[in-house]
């Protein structure tokens, strides 16, 4: 049997993060959780098995979800990116190439389908390696 996909979930709202993590874990994914972009970047440095980043747009700290997505795209091109928001719908030009967007609130099946689609887009790229930006 294949190893489960490893998802890094970045969401500052604890309830939203808990629900999303439960949905993803119930779908068979391994979920790592982070509350902000800085913590997520530290996790990526130590977890080369992360295959998909799923991040909220609006988060506290110096880097929001769009900034995190761009940084991850530049430093870890083997990681697929999914961005979610209930307040902001980014223009396609604001997103790194290959990034998908999902609007909140999202159905459980829509979330798992989006994660699988992002992961499929990354197949063949292997494990990521963090490069300094």
Briefly describe each language-model feature range:
Residues 18-26:
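Charged docking surfaces used in two-component/phosphorelay signaling
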Residues 106-119, 123-127:
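C-terminal output helix
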């Amino acid at each position: 049997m294949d190893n489960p996909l490893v998802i890094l979930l970045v969401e500052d709202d604890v309830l939203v993060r808990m629900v999303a993590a439960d949905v993803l874990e119930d779908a068979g994914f391994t979920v790592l959780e982070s509350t902000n972009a800085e913590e997520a970047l530290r996790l990526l440095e130590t977890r080369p098995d992360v295959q998909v980043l799923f991040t909220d747009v609006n988060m506290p700290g110096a880097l929001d979800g769009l900034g995190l997505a761009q940084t991850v795209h530049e430093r870890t091109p083997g990681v697929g990116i999914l961005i979610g928001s209930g307040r902001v719908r980014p223009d396609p030009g604001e997103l790194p190439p290959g990034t998908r967007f999902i609007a909140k609130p999202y159905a459980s099946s829509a979330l798992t389908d989006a994660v699988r689609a992002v992961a499929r887009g990354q197949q063949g790229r292997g494990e990521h390696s963090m490069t300094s930006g």
